Amino acid sequence: MEEIDKEWLEDVYNVDTGNLYKCTYPADLNYIGDNQEAYKNIMNNPETRAYDLSTNETEDNYSRLVDLIGILNLPVNANYPTYISTILNVESVLKSFAIDVATGNWDDYFYNKNNYYLYDNPATGRFEYFTFDTDNTFGVDWVNRDWAQRN
């Protein structure tokens, strides 16, 4: 698998200037307020971030990520699809989720709140979602449990 970096973003999206967040446990997308620092320090460890900004590190800006998480946690009503599609490429999420389920990927957002990226694509103004680190798929079991049945 290719390394997810600015070169990869340029190849896939034709733009590499947006914020790329590497999301690892416990990146559960739960809204904990509008303070950016709260999302930077979920793990209470300044060396490790659940939402790790992998590009534009000097700006260290999490405001759009906080906006996304806030919208994801709105009460579901008739307007929810409109709200969410203004900030998230829903199709990219659904495709990734479908592949995760089809391959039995249990080490993902659904089960471990882990191993995904969010890219704030400046060309579209929406976040892209994609899975990474798919070594635990197709029934791979490292703790003597049938994780492929968990999805």
What residue ranges belong to the model's regions?
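Phosphate/dinucleotide-binding and metal-coordinating scaffold of catalytic cores
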Residues: 1-151
